[in-house]
Amino acid sequence: SQSADSIVLKRIIGEGSEIYGEGHSSFIGAGVTIGNGSVVRDSIIMKGTQIGENVVIDKAIIAENCSIGDNVTLGVGEEKPNKFNEKIYSFGLVTIGEDSEVPSNVSVGKNTAISGKTTKEDYPEGILDSGEVIIKAGDSE
């Protein structure tokens, strides 16, 4: 469903999704919730993902069953030179693996990759700069 105050342009919305913020040129999977004051642009949000309030997501692919806290920014900010080659700038997508948590008040730059099953402990600085990666081994069950 879509609240009366939400703005959704050029989008595909899955069944059971609730959008209270804005969605622009994005795919929103089934059972996704996007909180008040949040903006999703040019992104793919897979089923079961919960997005908090006042979140900005730009050019991201977020896998199934993720949790994005309040006041998070994904793929927003200045383009920065690559840490290994200053002639290469980080304009790329943000990718987040399944069952991951991005806690409230975290900033994630452009061209970043976050593996599946991350938790708030994986963000001790509260920031992931453009071009950086978080890799976390899955459970060995």
Residue ranges and their predicted role:
Residues 1-141:
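Left-handed beta-helix
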